[in-house]
């Protein structure tokens, strides 16, 4: 079977790898010069199934209003003048209730836990290296109210069988020794020992090389213009004015998926939520993290690679604007210096990327009303966490194999206005 995968971020490359491993003849098309050159390039480096939590949560509307007036706020909304932005925010607000939160978190956890298992199996099979560590995630709380609020998430962790440890302020240094210097600023934390870390860019490029050895044909610097439709099937994809054909097609264009599918009348509710990161060389290892921490107050993750610290976070709704905002830069610097001042800020690199976010925070993985078009997009902040599981899942769906986990609620069908099958 011939399959064309559109997109060479971590989701597209993982999809191609698993398809090829199961015998498909795969071609990957991308406008960039290589794999992982956009959203997968500089993310926070966390592989954290336990923190697969919907942004659309009870209390978020109130918090969003409060953040509008807060310095170093984790969320910024810049109206871009489009009706689509307002519609997407309205859809998200509809999910900010306990019932929707529970449904969406279960779906996210299902994919994320499966994905971690797939990653471990892949690592065992291939020996792939990407500055990976398996030392867990530590969520940090600066306020007692945060410690109390986390009980809701702990109940879900228990239901899903996820190992965790709730720590008081004095116990944080046992997990992250460098936090002994910031103990007076923290009241406690939630430690998930089974989470992992790694450089998504290194992983994606290494996996692409492995996929090439399996026969995957990567074509970069391609202007992927449109899908050619005939009835209820895709007949080809127009690239640089020419039409390439396959038996089946997988769309993994991230934030650009929605606009690409507009001519097909598939209304994909994926909005680009802008995030930022710093990559900092380590000069004082004793003041650097061992694994990854998540500052609950500022919604910023600080992750250890081999000789670098990756600091990522923020959420900015401003359309496809890729400008670097110095206020966000200052926030990332402030949180890093506050907790782990072991890097050389003078040598730090500042980056931004667009996360493909759905209003319910759950990715869109599965079939469409077109018999041979499949979607693997909308992973939001969790593309790295969910990549391998999503790739394996979509490969099984495309090839009509039995899936390892339930696909309930993951396809575009959950959005009735999308005309999905």
UniProtKB/Swiss-Prot annotation:
SUPFAM superfamilies: FAD-linked reductases, C-terminal domain, FAD/NAD(P)-binding domain. FAD binds at residues 3-17. Its cofactor is FAD. Keywords: FAD, Flavoprotein, Oxidoreductase. One of its GO terms (molecular function) is D-amino-acid dehydrogenase activity. Pathway: Amino-acid degradation; D-alanine degradation; NH(3) and pyruvate from D-alanine: step 1/1. It holds the Pfam family DAO. Its EC number is 1.4.99.-. GO terms for biological process: D-alanine catabolic process. It catalyses: a D-alpha-amino acid + A + H2O = a 2-oxocarboxylate + AH2 + NH4(+). One of its GO terms (cellular component) is cytoplasm. PANTHER family: D-AMINO ACID DEHYDROGENASE, SARCOSINE DEHYDROGENASE-RELATED. Belongs to the DadA oxidoreductase family. Oxidative deamination of D-amino acids. HAMAP family: DadA (MF_01202). This is D-amino acid dehydrogenase. It comes from Acinetobacter baumannii (strain SDF).
